[in-house]
């Protein structure tokens, strides 16, 4: 199935989903190591078997990752390599997904109740807005298909809604600073203790200066995961979740809390 899709001159959204599932063997949401090398090998073989040249995007991709053991790509990168249908591809090229800060602002717009989740209807509106900003419209059937596929692609725990970290897979890997914070998340008890420690004036929220102090300490303790030189970027992106400069516990928990365990 994947071979025939890789030979197509135009890959539909549902075919793209099937290709992704085929190669993301461990369901991590990323292709790396053997998964990535399998993709490169099968892509080259499929195109050759069909008598097709690699497209310029495919050649660049093979040159960049073919000889690397440490390569890692997400859904966004693959969507740019394969000849994916235009409207679906636009979802990965929109301005709101060019940087983590813009992504956080977009998240805040749609997670209106600060629940930490975007549910099906909210996701549908989010995708509709992205396409409209690119001056594209799709009918309700196609929009429902895209919404369903996005849930299948990103909803790793199959609860029918997307958490911030799941939704962030719409970002290119190099832009997704949330990946860095996966290794430094705290259990609920530790997070609450840290929040109260850095909420120095006890007003129930953390401001930019308090966040700066928290990030500096986190970087010092987790040098393998976090780069202290990137604090301005981390801070800008996290503060995009704030309410007028006030970063409440539930907002910061999206980044730093791993839950109650």
Curated annotation (Swiss-Prot):
Buffers cytosolic calcium. May stimulate a membrane Ca(2+)-ATPase and a 3',5'-cyclic nucleotide phosphodiesterase. This is Calbindin. The keyword Transmembrane helix does not apply. It comes from Bos taurus. InterPro entries: Calbindin_Ca-bind, Calbindin_six-EFh_dom, EF-hand-dom_pair, EF_Hand_1_Ca_BS, EF_hand_dom. Ca(2+) 1 binds at residues 24, 26, 28, 30, 35. Keywords: Acetylation, Calcium, Metal-binding, Repeat, Vitamin D. GO terms for molecular function: calcium ion binding; calcium ion binding involved in regulation of postsynaptic cytosolic calcium ion concentration; calcium ion binding involved in regulation of presynaptic cytosolic calcium ion concentration; vitamin D binding; zinc ion binding. GO terms for biological process: locomotory behavior; long-term memory; metanephric collecting duct development; metanephric connecting tubule development; metanephric distal convoluted tubule development; metanephric part of ureteric bud development; retina layer formation; short-term memory. Ca(2+) 3 binds at residues 155, 157, 159, 161, 166. Ca(2+) 2 binds at residues 111, 113, 115, 122. PROSITE patterns: EF_HAND_1, EF_HAND_2. The gene is CALB1. Belongs to the calbindin family. The modification N-acetylalanine is found at residue 2.
């Amino acid at each position: 199935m994947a071979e025939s899709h890789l030979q197509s001159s135009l890959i539909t959204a549902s075919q793209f989903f099937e290709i992704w599932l085929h190669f993301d063997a461990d369901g991590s949401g990323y292709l790396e190591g053997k998964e990535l090398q399998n993709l490169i090998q099968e892509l080259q073989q499929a195109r050759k078997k069909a008598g097709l040249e690699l497209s310029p995007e495919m050649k660049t991709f093979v040159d960049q990752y073919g000889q690397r053991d440490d390569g890692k790509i997400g859904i966004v990168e693959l969507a740019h390599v394969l000849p994916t249908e235009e409207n679906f591809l636009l979802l990965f090229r929109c301005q709101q997904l060019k940087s983590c800060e813009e992504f956080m602002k977009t998240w805040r717009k749609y997670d209106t109740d600060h629940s930490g989740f975007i549910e099906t209807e909210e996701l549908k509106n989010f995708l509709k807005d992205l396409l409209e900003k690119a001056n594209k419209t799709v009918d309700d059937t196609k929009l429902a298909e895209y919404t369903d596929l996005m849930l299948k692609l990103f909803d790793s725990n199959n609860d029918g809604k997307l958490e911030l970290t799941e939704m962030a897979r719409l970002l290119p890997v190099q832009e997704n600073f949330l990946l860095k914070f996966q290794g430094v998340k705290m259990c609920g008890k530790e997070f609450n203790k840290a929040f109260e420690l850095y909420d120095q004036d006890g007003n129930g929220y953390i401001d930019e200066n308090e966040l700066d102090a928290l990030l500096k300490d986190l970087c010092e303790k987790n040098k393998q995961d976090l780069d202290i030189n990137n604090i301005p970027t981390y801070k800008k992106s996290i503060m995009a979740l704030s309410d007028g400069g006030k970063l409440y516990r539930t907002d910061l928990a999206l980044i730093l809390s791993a839950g109650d365990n």
